[in-house]
Amino acid sequence: MQRDYLIRVETESMSDFKRLNSLMIGFVIKGEAHIYDENNMTQCNSGDIFIINHRDLYRFQLQQDGIICYIQFQMKYLADKFDDVHCLYFHLTDATTTKNIHQLRNIMARLVSTHIRHNELSKLTEQQLVIQLLMHMIHYVPRTYHSNQSILNDDKVNQVCDYIELHFHEDLSLSELSEYVGWSESHLSKKFTESLGVGFHHFLNTTRIEHAKLDLTYTDETITDIALQNGFSSAASFARTFKHFTHQTPKQYRGDRPAITENQQSAQHDYHDRELILLLNDYIEEMNHFIEDIEKMNYKEIAFQPTNHQLNQFNHIIQVGYLRNLLNTQYQSQLLTCHHDFQVNEVLAYDVIPYIMKKLNAPFTYDAEISNIFYDIDLCLDFLLDHNFSLTMHLDQYDSRDYIDAFKIFIHHVALHVSHRKDLKFNLYVTTLHTSLIEMIDYFKALFPNGGLYIHLDQATERHLPLLKRLEPHIDHFVFDANSNDAVDFNKMNDDEFKTASQMIINKTNYLIDLMHRHRLKRPLILLNWNTLTGDTFITNGEYFRGGIIIEQLLKLSSKVEGIGYWLNYDLHVSHCKNERDYMNSIELFHQYNGKRPVYFTALLFNKLTSNILYSDDTCIVTGTDSNFQILLYDAKHFNPYLALDNQMNMRATEMIHLNINALEEGMYKIKHFTLDKENGALFNLWRKHHTIHGMDKDSIDYVNRMSFPKLEVYDIDITDTLALNIKMITNGIHLIEVKRYPSS
């Protein structure tokens, strides 16, 4: 039976060049080796990897005590695994990162060690490692593509050679091959001899004999079987041809070589199996994934281009419900964490005027000499002032006289409280318009000239256009809501609905921009309550990972919207919702026990982008400068969130993105690679695994919060011109890569 691949350890040099009719990858186990090709010599030291491609001339020159190992793949085996073997021309370059070199060497060391050990499961383990090696080469080693459709006449001889290597075991003729390349028989024969120095039939028989030698050496099959499976019509024909090329009969050739069993062929010369295994162990590391589960590959070439576009960062507005919630030390800590990680500086609180009216109308009278009805409010204001937060307060049902009077008392007190300190940035937000707002805003502006007025904008606002025009000089922002879940019926599986829902937020934004333009209203927008597709239950909201979808929306909105709103945490959010559907109108940053939700990390990663855009497309944006830049890649797939609950219908897909950043200045660069996806940073799965009917204890809480973070990889790389990155993208995942060149020494 023809062997699919060979696994060898070599301690002796080759005396002559040989043309490889297969694909070879190996590394130096010990010492030093010189690898020669037609034009160059490459010096390889211990641990260095080498690759010799199909049809290349090569020679090994091992220095004293040098040992190399290699895996040699037969082209017929590769042709069974790949649609186009012409794509399997590999180049080890600066673009092959140290991490990927380590992983290739790791797999090969395991493979050779397994081959030498030859235990009960060696063959099965070998086959798994061989597939792993090929997958890793395909994904992480740069390749050159040669399409059969674009081969020029000068390359047609090579095309014939490749065809022979894949089909040598079949009945081949000069007539068949000339038709294959579109030449006449005489022209092909002439070109073949000119290019290779031998005729077509000589080359065909040489190829068959080389493969037959392997079978004679490594199998115990009969000579007749070997003859037939290598393209000879009979054992007699095989024997004549074999003796012509080797000056031996097949039987003599086999007899001159000792019987080499599967576990012995790698342990020749001065090294015993145990010594080789000990040497190989130095290169074996822990492997995270045994088989790469890549379903699709994508190739992206990026060259930085000057652009007039800028990326705008958002002002983040955090909803906390009642103002008194700011007295909670856990909530204070969460706000400060947000402020540190992505510059949160504005808090939105519910209307405090009804609370003040209740105190003012209490059956007993507060004595101003011994008490302060604003005591708890003052503590909240002090926290905001101490940490440079601005306060936006939602005014609700403000059309009564009692309300207006209480409002003025409150505003006057706040002005007095902050007068001896730095100014408080104070804003008012209304969702409905009433003429009493004019009196209130005049009083407010007299005490807080830098204060802002936020007006909720929707179709109903048009009915109050005259009042809106009167208030326009005081308006700082228009506020709106947009929830993609409102656009679909989750009981249906209509893809068109989900496609429409994916555009719902940006479509509503554009509608409001157009409405403002029609009525000559020019103010920045704030998207306060919003959500992407999540389904209409708490479970789908957690299971449906959508980091990439959120990033997609943020990028689309960055040039149209100035502010983005979030609820601070789950408990505050859910306590102000009527039902699950109402809960889906907004997004919170924290879950319980200070667990950070993926949207928190999405905001954090987005904040790492800078304003200068170097490159952008539908799934990638690069910002910064050519020596200090940020690459953001994301996947955004909109589908019914209920499918995320169906284990039988796995909506998780994996794509390998081969990314090249070209024309970089030569030097040493630092790479920081953040990965946020369902396997790295998703809180919900870990939460459910560690949650019991009695909740979670401290150990579980600490563990879940510690593990629910994006993955971070940091390394240095020496770049001469091109930065090559291999990125494993899971459905709706996000990758942020920060690249910074070190100063020249």
Swiss-Prot record:
PROSITE patterns, sorted: HTH_ARAC_FAMILY_2
Signal peptide positions (record): none
UniProt entry tagged with the keyword Protease: no
DNA-binding region: 175-196, 223-246
Gene3D superfamilies assigned: Glycosidases, Glycosyl hydrolase domain, family 39, Homeodomain-like
InterPro entries noted in UniProt: Glycoside_hydrolase_SF, Homeodomain-like_sf, HTH-like, HTH_AraC, Tscrpt_reg_AraC-type_HTH
Keyword Ribosomal protein: no
SUPFAM superfamilies: (Trans)glycosidases, Glycosyl hydrolase domain, Homeodomain-like, Regulatory protein AraC
Record keywords: DNA-binding, Repeat, Transcription, Transcription regulation
Protein's name in the database: Uncharacterized HTH-type transcriptional regulator SACOL0084
